Each structure stands twice: as C-alpha cells, then as structure tokens.
Curated annotation (Swiss-Prot):
Domain remarks: Histone deacetylase domain 1 mediates the E3 ubiquitin-protein ligase activity.
Name of the coding gene: Hdac6
Record field: catalytic activity: N(6)-acetyl-L-lysyl-[protein] + H2O = L-lysyl-[protein] + acetate; N(6)-acetyl-L-lysyl-[alpha-tubulin] + H2O = L-lysyl-[alpha-tubulin] + acetate
Catalytic residues as annotated in Swiss-Prot or TrEMBL: 215, 641
Record's protein name: Protein deacetylase HDAC6
Record's GO cellular component terms: aggresome; axon; axon cytoplasm; caveola; cell leading edge; centrosome; ciliary basal body; cytoplasm
UniProt PTM: Phosphorylated by AURKA; phosphorylation increases HDAC6-mediated deacetylation of alpha-tubulin and subsequent disassembly of cilia. Ubiquitinated. Its polyubiquitination however does not lead to its degradation.
Residue positions where Omega-N-methylarginine is found in the record: 32
Sorted UniProt keywords: Actin-binding, Autophagy, Cell projection, Chromatin regulator, Cytoplasm, Cytoskeleton, Hydrolase, Metal-binding, Methylation, Nucleus, Phosphoprotein, Repeat, Repressor, Transcription, Transcription regulation, Transferase, Ubl conjugation, Ubl conjugation pathway, Zinc, Zinc-finger
Region (Disordered): 1-61, 972-1042
GO biological process: actin filament organization; aggresome assembly; axonal transport of mitochondrion; cellular response to hydrogen peroxide; cellular response to misfolded protein; cellular response to parathyroid hormone stimulus; cellular response to topologically incorrect protein; cilium disassembly
Ligase as UniProt keyword: no
Gene Ontology MF: a single term: zinc ion binding
PTM annotation (Phosphoserine): residues: 21, 1009
C-alpha cells in the first residue's frame, strides 16, 4: 500500500459509529422452518417497489463489475512470488573478542555453535548463501553521527590499554582492534539481505552476525553494541528502496533502547519490543523501557514496549558423579531444577504477539519486517532467566511471515547459552524455510504477570490504534485474584525440562488435494438456479489448474465413506433412510426432500454425499500418516448442517465431523481436534455432534442477526458453550449484521480464535471452509476477500504441527469461491499471504460480538483474561484539564494530525485522539486512583538524565544481571521525581525544569518520559527537557474531587480555578478533554419504563439516607448512593445485576457491564423526565 502526503499510518484515529440497537420487527422474524438463504421481509409499499425496480436495473452492471474485479485479482503469480531463504554467515565476524576477559559472554563461540547446529540439521545447504559486505560510512551515517563513526574507526589503531580505557567510558562493552571492521561487516550483512529481499532475489533471510546492534544509539556504544544494524537497515531501505512503512520487532530479552530512541518520533517505523524489565530492576534500567512509553510527537503510538516482570527462580538437587568400587563406569549424574517461579514461556510471547503486535501490524501494513532476533529469552540462558523454547520462536517467526508479503529479515542479537542459542536460530530458520512449526507444550496460556503486562500495554496503545478498541475489558477484583491463584498453583508445580530435540519433517509432497467430478451428479431436478450447483466444485478445480496450484499439490483419489465411518456421527436409521433414496421416483424424492429443512434430493445424492465424506476421510489418512502435511477437499454436497439423524441446509452427511472421528479412530485415542467453521451459516450439526466432547474444540463464526439468520434460533448464540464435559469447547462468534470483512475476521482471530486455539493446543485442525462470507456471495452479505482467507489460513497453520485440512462447505458466487479457495491453497503451499492494502478498522458491531464471546468464555480459557484490573470508573473520571501546546508547532494529535481547537475528550479515557499521560503504574498500583495530570516534553537520549534512569551500571554483568538492591534505587528515583514541584506551583504558577546536555558520552542514556498518551511529548533526541507537573497540593485537591467527578459522580460544577491550577500561563490557548460516552450498548434492553409515580432525583439513598451523591437504577428505579459515599448502588448492582444507572447529579448514564458512560435515544425519555424533575423544564434539545 502506498501513500502520499499524510500517510495512512500517521493518521489520527477516526471516530466510528457504534452499532445501533436493531429494530425489532416481528414480521422480519423467521421461524425455524425458514429456508436457507431466505431473508426477512414484509409486504412492500410503493416506495419499496420503486426502489426494487431501480436496484434491479443497477444490479446487473454491479454484479458484472464485481466479477471483473474479482477476476482481476492476480493470484497466478507463481513466477513473481520470491522463493528461497537467504543466509549471511561470515567467519570474519569471529575476528574480535574481549582481550582482557576470556569469559566475556559475547564471544566467537556463539557463531561457532550456531554453525555446527545448522550443519547438523542440514540447513546451510537449503539456504541461499550471500557474501557479507562492509557497510559504507555514508550508510552508517544514515543513523550514526560522523564524529561517533570516526571515533570508532580510530579503535583499529589503539593498543589494549587504550581500548580498555575507551570501553570503560561506555556501559557493558569491550573493544578490540577488529571491533570496528566486524561491526561494519555485520551491518553490511543486513543491508545485503535488504537488497536481496526487496529485489525479489529471495523471500526472506537471516543474518547470523556479531556484534549485536540494538542497544547502539546515534553517538553511543552500549550493551555489547557498536552500530545499530537494523536501524541502519531501515533507513537504507527507506532511502534506496523507497519503503514507506517498516516494522522492527525486537524479541531480545534486553530492551533495545538504542533502536527505540532512533525512531521514537518517526511514524514510518513501528518499533515493538518484548523484554525483561522487572519494574526497572533489569538492564538497561530505564523508565523508557516500560509499557507507558509509546513514542513522541508524530511518532506517538509507534513505539510499543511489552515489559516482562517475572523471571525463573529455581531450586536444584545435585547428584554427583561417582565411580563405584571396582568399576570404571560413571554412575548417574544429573542436575534437576524445580522452578519455584517460572520465567516467561512460549505462551506469554505468543499472547503478546496475538493481542498486541499482530493487530497493530495489520493496521500499520508494513512493507518490510526486520527482527532483532536475540535468543537470550530461551530456557537456560544465564542472562534472560526466561523459559521460552526454540519451538516458541518458530511460532513467532511464522506469525511475522504473514506480514509485508513475506518480506522478513532476522538479524542475530543476543543469546548466551550456546546450545539454546544454536537451537533458537535453527528453529527460526526452519520456519523461514517453510517447515511447519513444532507443537508446543500444553497448556499454552499466558501467566498472570504476562496478562498484566499485556493489558497495560494495550491500554497505553489503544488511543492510537483503531484496531485495539475494546481490546481490554474490566474484570472484577475477586475474579482477578482467583485467576492469579490458579496461575500460581499451575506454575508452582511446573518442572523445567531440557530443551526438546525438535524435528522438522521434510515432506516431498506438502499439500494434498482431493477432488472427484462424480460429486457433480448431485443436482436439483426442480430448480436449475439453486445456489448449491454442481458447477461449484468444477469451477474451483478448473481455477486451481489454471493458476498452476493443482500441479503443486499431490492429487489423492476420493473414495466413498464406509458405513462404519458414517455411523461414528450419524444414526443407522438415518443412513439407511438416505440410502433408500437411490431407488426412489422423482415425486417421492421431492416429497422426501420436503421432510427436511432446505434440502433437495436426487437419485445420486446418497452416493455423492458418501463420496464427499469419504474424500475428507482419505485426506485425514494422508495427513496423519505423513503422506502430506496439509490438504484441501473440494467436495459437495456440504456437510456442517447435517445432524446425527437429519439432513439440513443442503447437507446430508457431516463430512468434517466424520473426518474428526475418523482421525481419532486412526490415532487410537481422543486426538485433540480443532474445528474452525468460517462458513457464514452456523454449523448446527457439527456443534450438536461434539457439544459434550472436550477432545474437539468447535469454533464457528457466522451471521446470526439475533437468531433470524439461517439456521435460525439460539443455537448459534454466544451463550451456547457446550454441555457436560464439553462445556467451554463450543465457541460461537455471532455476527448480528452484514458486511463483516477481513478486519472483523482478523480481529476475531487475534483476540479470540487463536488465543483459545493455542491454549487448546490441537493435534489436528479441520476447517469447515465455506466461502459464503466472501465478497459477492448472494447469501452471506459479507465482504471477506480472497486475501483475507489467505491470512486466516496462514495464521491457523502454526497449530497442530501444520496438520490442517480445508473441507469445502458453502459459497455460492462461483468466482468468489474459486479465488478464495485458491488463496487458501497458496497459503497451505507455503506462499506468503498478499498484503491487505485496503484494510478498514473492525466494525463496532463486530467488536461488540467479540467482547460478548470473551465475556462468556473467559471463565473457561485463561488466554482470554486480558482485563482491566483497576477501577475503570475511578480511572475514567470527568476531570477537565487544559493543555497548551507549544507555540512553535501546530497542535499534533496522537497520530500526527492537527487537532482542532476545543476538541473535547476525556483525560484518561480509552478513545481520545490525544490522551493525557498518566503516572507510571505497576501491578501493585493497579487499584490506585487516576494518576495526576502531567505534561511532558522529553529529555535528550544523549544526555545524563538521572530522573529517568532507574539505575546505572557499567560492568559486563549488568546486561542481564539484575541486582536485588536496585529496588530502593527505583523507589528513591521515583520519589525524588515526585517531589520536584514547588510551593509556587501550588499557587497556580508553573516552573520549568531543564537539564543541559552532557558533553560526556559515557553518561549518555535515555531521558524518554515513561508517560503514554501525551500528544505534546517530544522525543529524547530533542535536547533540553521541561516538565510541567501539578503541585502535590493541587494533586491532593484534585484527588479529593474525584468522588464528585468519577464514575457515578455525575459532576458537580468544577471551579474555574481548578481548570488552570498548576498550569500557570498555559491557560491562554486551550484544548479541553472530557468524557466521550458510548452511543450504544447491548444492555439498553434492561431499561424499564418510568414508573407511574414519576421520577424523583432528589430522593435519598434507600439504604443510608444520604443525599450527597445518588444514582437511580433504570431497571427497578430504586435510588442508592455512589461508591464515593457508601457504595450502595454498587452493592445493588452486584446483587440485582441491573446494568444501567442514572446520575441524580448530572443526569449521565453509566453501564456497569460495559464499564462506560452511555448516551442513546432509548435513554432520552428517562433523562428528560429527570431533567424536568430537577430543573422544572425538559431538556432543551428535545423541545
């Protein structure tokens, strides 16, 4: 996707309409017996008849345009899709080491170990080797200063003493006469891969290099790093290859502060770092490494930090080797580690990618992805003290391969356990080469600490990315405590295992294809225009042959299903009933078809249904036996509506269900099977077959329209979760309207489907691949593109060791289903999914459905518990804050767009275009009240910024070596920062604090403010800093007002002095922030009519008699006091579950279940009545 002027990646978050409450038209409600594909309708009036006639005239050209557009999608790009994985590995990179410390962890043995592992696994011969080259000085100057480069160049001529003195002026580095040349060679190696990837010589690549680079700043060595390879590569790609959007992912266990500082003002580079932090106790001890730092100026929102605050802590038992008397053989020797606390595991990293990185990356749409691939988070690394595995990094690599059209480059950073490092590199390289991801250890669910970090990061980023709207939900304190106890119990018994010896099967045939034209003999004898036409499978197969995909697959012969296979899901009576139709006359066939719902039967129906189901079983056999890795079954009639004893919705035998049972029979056990049903209709038959079976996880995304879309009824509702032992293993995502597209399905994948699927950890994935949600389908009314289906398939391919099977269900636009199945086949064959160039934000209706499902299923799945744990009502207080932006620049919003004067948004709310920063918080502060308002202009990253450096150490042990005495340093630093305001500020004047840049490079570090959401923040690169804070007295006064201004407070009048207190002269140019309520919520139906006695907002609290601040329940109309008085309304809500309440103070409406203010037309009557009672007149805008 290209852009001109203001790029879409720098746009301001746009306001979006919330879903409107649907009109309840009784005439539009169909009974269970309605036909599949039928739409609700009522008798047309004259206007509707005219409109229908006009639309009929326009429909033919529109349909033709759609067909032409779909045909124009060029999926036959075999000759243009780059293939091959590049590898740069040069022995010259081992020509430097620490002259004065042979035990220094960054040493040449790291590359030796990697090379041996790659040779052992045969990976070197599978890669395209590239000769490393030296980076030119002009290329280094794209990021680094000339003075710094010249200084590093002089190290070639220094003796050991001089090198040691210079290295001592930096933090955690050593210098060698060859350090400069090797650093230039390392940077040049990455640049060579950039040229190869962007020039389509290869698809992706890896640079196995040293020294690392992500800590290096513009004019500063740091943390073993001299030049920042990826930063130079990003600027190089932008300059030479005209790249406009680059994603840098840093999964090294240390925060890549150097990369962050280089790009923290730049909206063209999205930087994502996931690292060990321990609340600032871990190197590099910076507040800028915390989740609250999101970038500065136009780059705000483009810096993403996920800080890990939990590490492994193990006790061990040691059994020494000994030689029994008379024996020359050594007895058992082992060291067993029992982890009392587990560091972050694969599940935690995967959760961060699914909930944060992938959604933002799909909205950002990078054109190149660069990875700072450090492997010091692997289990056994002495620096990281984490518990990730090589298989986990293979999955992370697989996720990233779906971005930027597959243009992905990994560049080695850290990793200091030689065996773990080598396995980590080989695991990621296997994935780059297209090998399937290994299965992970169960359960794959994030721990409580990871959930907290991810939730904090999401809340910090939500103001800047539309796709993150409603990404975190409120959670009760009791539920949080229960979840944490559950996590502690599970983790307390977790025993660390040795690194698994992962194997990647090298299959000659990757994708199997089953098709038999005999299935076309099933046809409708009475309606030649029936949507379930024999041409469906023929058109798909022809298209696969035309674009060359069929030739790349292994064609497998179809076979009829055996009775024993059919009987695993269907009753014997039903099978015989269908078999009997083979000999029926035409009139009897018509009568028999009418006995079922939306069914036609012909003499060949039974044989075709038997063949379709048998084809699915044949494909299962091929996948489980290793004959192929994955496959597609182009079959008809479809199957997912078929019940155990009844045909339904064009379906006779449930092919996917029978295939699942057949797989379990082959395995001889209850194989864990994931069934994903993306057909636009709910697969009622599949759900009923497995609803009591915990070995099969059934996930369905479908049009529901509140029970009025086929197959009608409440079976597809989110509340249907399974029964008995299968409770929680049925997941329904009901769409309550049309036009759901790629963004809506991807949001569901990221937030719901993949988290649950990874936690379930299936051994086989079956997809009920109906394509009637595709663009142009006459029944679905949705807008999923072929490219969208390619991405959905790619994301599921990381599961079950890549064992995934697509079985055709519905889809009735012949062009759409052909293009969509071809796109899925591309993904199965390992081709990168195409970029989604016109991805809109998810619809509010889709987000509502997703949130509804999460609320239902979070009790069953730990991976869905990314919730707000602070009191949302307190945090969302209605305090108004005035902020003046710098006069030297036009006001800049969170995404770099101009903010209109007087834009009203709420301080601290979740959807502002320019939110105010808040005081940095930790897990222990999660229940604290709203942080004090703070305006910050950043400090220079090239100065001594003591106020933002949590600790400063210069030994080699500090990189990864957290010390226990640093807690006091952190607390002291934060306390001193909080005490910088003066009494003059308390009186309303504001004093600026500045720090001049240091001339000593050895003291350079970040000064980045940790505060998120401040549009006026500036980059640490800008030099002088100035911080404006509310005085401690003003903060206390403001906190005392929270009871009147938060949650159910409604809002007493705020003294104008409070608006400007602490801001001094910053009140001349005003930008206001206030609460933005929801325009709709799903709980409005709980609002009852006003009682006959009327509404009295002056009533006292029914429990305590208080009249200070009360609320009226809009269900029972009882009056109780606010949580800031005696919290009796909160108690009433918890006891009655009545969701909506009205403030007797300012007549605002709060929904406890949505945890938000709501303003909707359904509330106008009660608000008008309250206004009449309170002020003696109706609301002005209603008169």
């Amino acid at each position: 996707m290209t852009s001109t002027g203001q790029d879409s990646s720098t746009r301001q978050r746009k306001s979006r309409h919330n879903p409107q409450s649907p009109l309840q038209d009784s005439s539009a409600t169909l009974k269970r017996g309605g036909k599949k594909g039928a739409v609700p309708h009522s008798s047309p009036n004259l206007a509707e008849v005219k409109k229908k006639g006009k639309m009929k005239k326009l429909s033919q050209p529109a349909e033709e345009d759609l067909i032409v557009g779909l045909q124009g999608l060029d999926l036959n790009s075999e000759t243009r899709v780059p293939v091959g994985t590049g590898l740069v590995f040069d022995e010259q990179l081992n020509d430097f080491h620490c002259l004065w410390d042979d035990s220094f962890p960054e040493n040449p043995e790291r590359l030796h170990a990697i090379k041996e592992q790659l040779i052992l696994e045969g990976l070197l011969g599978r890669c395209v080797s590239f000769q490393a080259r030296f980076a030119e000085k002009e290329e280094l100057m794209l990021v680094h200063s000339l003075e710094y480069i010249d200084l590093m160049e002089t190290t070639q001529y220094m003796n050991e003493g001089e090198l040691r003195v210079l290295a001592g002026t930096y933090d955690s580095v050593y210098l060698h006469p060859n350090s400069y040349s090797c650093a230039c060679l390392a940077t040049g190696s990455v640049l060579r891969l950039v040229d190869a990837v962007m020039g389509a010589e290869i698809r992706n690549g890896m640079a196995v290099i040293r020294p690392p680079g992500h800590h290096a700043q513009r004019s500063l060595m740091d943390g073993y790093c001299m030049f920042n390879h990826l930063a130079v590569a990003a600027r190089y790609a932008q300059k030479k290859h005209r790249i406009q959007r680059i994603l840098i992912v840093d999964w090294d266990v240390h925060h890549g502060q150097g990369t962050q500082f280089i790009f923290d003002q730049d909206p063209s580079v999205l930087y994502f770092s996931i690292h060990r932090y321990e609340h600032g106790r871990f190197w590099p001890h910076l507040k800028a490494s915390n989740w609250s730092t999101t970038g500065f100026g136009q780059g705000q929102g483009y810096t993403i930090n996920v800080p890990w605050n939990q590490v492994s802590f193990c006790s061990h038992k040691l059994s020494l080797a000994c030689f029994p008397r008379g024996s020359r053989e050594m007895t058992d020797y082992y060291i067993a580690f029992l982890c009392l606390q587990v560091g972050m595991r694969d599940a935690d990293y995967i959760a961060a990618f699914l909930h944060i990185l992938l959604p933002v990356a799909f909205e950002f749409q990078p054109q190149l992805v660069l990875v700072a691939a450090g492997f010091d988070a692997l289990h056994g690394d002495p620096k990281g003290e984490m518990s990730a595995t090589p298989a986990g990094f293979a999955h992370l690599t697989h996720f990233l391969m779906g971005l930027a059209g597959g243009k992905l480059i990994l560049s080695l950073e850290g990793g200091y356990n030689l065996h773990a490092l080598a396995k980590g590199v080989s695991g990621s390289l296997h994935t780059l080469l297209g090998d399937p991801c290994p299965m992970l250890e169960s359960p794959v669910a994030p721990c409580a600490s990871a959930q907290t970090s991810i939730s904090c990061t999401l809340e910090a980023l939500e103001p800047f990315w539309e796709v993150l709207e409603r990404s975190v939900e409120p959670q009760d304190e009791d539920e949080v405590e229960g979840d944490m106890l559950e996590d502690e119990e599970e983790e307390g018994h977790w025993e660390a295992t040795a690194l698994p010896m992962d194997t990647w099967p090298l299959l000659q045939n990757r994708t199997g294809l089953v098709y038999d034209e005999r299935m076309m003999s099933h046809c409708n004898l009475w309606d030649n225009h029936h949507p379930e036409t024999p041409q469906r499978i023929l058109r798909i197969m022809c298209h696969l042959e035309e674009v060359g995909l069929a030739a790349r697959c292994l064609i497998l012969p179809a076979r009829p299903a055996l009775d024993s296979e059919l009987l695993t899901c269907h009753s014997a009576e039903y099978v015989e009933r269908l078999r009997a139709t083979e000999k029926m006359k035409t009139r009897d066939l018509h009568r028999e078809g009418a006995n079922f719902e939306s069914i036609y039967i012909c003499p060949s129906t039974f044989a075709c249904a038997q063949l379709a189901t048998g084809a699915a079983c044949r494909l299962v056999e091929a996948v489980l036996s290793g004959e192929v890795l994955n496959g597609i079954a182009i079959v008809r009639p479809p199957g997912h509506h078929a019940e155990p004893d009844a045909a339904c919705g064009f379906c006779f035998f449930n092919s996917v269900a029978v295939a699942a049972r057949h797989a379990q029979v082959i395995a001889g056990r209850a194989l864990r099977i994931l069934i994903v049903d993306w057909d636009v209709h709910h697969g009622n038959g599949t759900q009923h077959i497995f609803e009591e079976d915990p070995s099969v996880l059934y996930v369905s995304l479908h049009r529901y329209d509140r029970g009025t879309f086929f197959p009608m009824g409440d079976e597809g509702a989110s509340s249907q979760v399974g029964r008995a032992a299968g409770t929680g293993f049925t997941v329904n995502v009901p769409w309550n309207g049309p036009r759901m597209g790629d963004a809506d399905y991807l949001a569901t994948w990221h937030r719901l489907v993949l988290p649950i699927a990874y936690e379930f950890n299936p051994e086989l994935v079956l997809i009920s691949a109906g394509f009637d949600a595709a663009q142009g389908d006459p029944l679905g009314g949705c807008q999923v593109t072929p490219e969208g289906y390619a991405h959905l398939t790619h994301l599921l391919m990381g599961l079950a060791g890549g064992r995934i099977i697509l079985i055709l269900e519905g889809g009735y636009n012949l062009t759409s289903i052909s293009e969509s199945m071809a796109a899925c086949t591309h993904s199965l064959l390992g081709d990168p999914p195409p970029q989604l160039t016109s991805l809109r934000p998810p619809q509010s209706g889709a987000l509502a459905s997703i949130s509804e499902v999460i609320q239902v299923h979070r009790k069953y799945w730990r991976s869905l518990r990314l919730m707000k744990m602070e009191d949302k009502e307190e945090r969302s207080s209605s305090r108004l804050v005035i902020k003046k932006l710098p006069q030297s620049a036009s006001p800049v919003s969170a995404k770099g767009m101009t903010t209109p004067k007087g834009k009203v948004l709420e301080a601290g709310m979740r959807k502002p275009t320019a939110a105010l920063p808040t005081k940095e918080s930790t897990l222990g502060q999660a229940k604290a009240k709203t942080a004090k308002a703070l305006l910050a202009q950043g400090q220079s990253s090239e100065q001594a910024a003591k106020g933002t450096t949590l600790d400063l150490a210069t030994s080699k042990d500090t990189v990864g070596g957290a010390t226990t005495d640093q807690c006091a340093s952190v607390a002291a630093t934060e306390n001193s920062a909080n005490q910088t305001t003066s009494g003059e500020e308390a009186s309303g004047e504001t004093e600026s604090f500045g720090t001049s840049p240091s001339s000593n490079a050895s003291k350079q570090t970040t000064g980045a403010s940790p505060l998120h959401g401040a549009a006026a923040q500036q980059s640490p690169e800008l030099g002088l800093s100035s911080t404006l804070e509310l005085s401690s007295e003003a903060q206390e006064v403001q906190e005392s007002e929270e009871g009147l201004l938060g949650e159910a407070a409604g809002g007493q009048d705020m003294n104008s002095l409070m608006l400007t207190q602490g801001f001094g002269d910053f009140n001349t140019q005003d930008v206001f922030y206030a609460v933005t309520p929801l325009s709709w919520c799903p709980h409005l139906m709980a609002v009852c009519p006003i009682p006959a006695a009327g509404l009295d907002v002056s009533q006292p609290c029914k429990t305590c008699g208080s009249v200070q601040e009360n609320w009226v329940c809009l269900t029972c109309y009882q009056v109780y006091c606010s949580r800031y008085v005696n919290a009796h309304m909160v108690c009433h809500h918890e006891a009655s579950e009545h969701p909506l309440v009205l403030s007797c103070v300012d007549l605002s409406t709060w929904c406890y279940l949505c945890q938000a203010y709501v303003h909707h037309e359904d509330l106008q009557d009660v608000k008008n009545a309250a206004h009449q009672n309170k002020f003696g007149e109706g609301m002005p805008h209603l008169q």
